[in-house]
């Protein structure tokens, strides 16, 4: 009977992959939500700094000038 539970769990994992859903959900990318791009280091022209990236190393930069 234990083998049935193992087969059922493997079946669910396979079906979840087929459905296109990630097995481990990714964290929300806040930089992309703010229409930004992650750059290593600092932002250069024509981009300006709007925050930090999820990895903590890069800068979240947006194109254009602040108004």
From Swiss-Prot:
It is found in: Secreted; Cytoplasmic granule. This is Gallinacin-7. Disulfide bonds join 31-60, 38-53, 43-61. PANTHER family: BETA-DEFENSIN, GALLINACIN-1-RELATED. One of its GO terms (cellular component) is extracellular space. Keywords: Antibiotic, Antimicrobial, Defensin, Disulfide bond, Secreted, Signal. Residues 1-19 form the signal peptide. Pfam families: Defensin_beta (PF00711). One of its GO terms (molecular function) is CCR6 chemokine receptor binding.
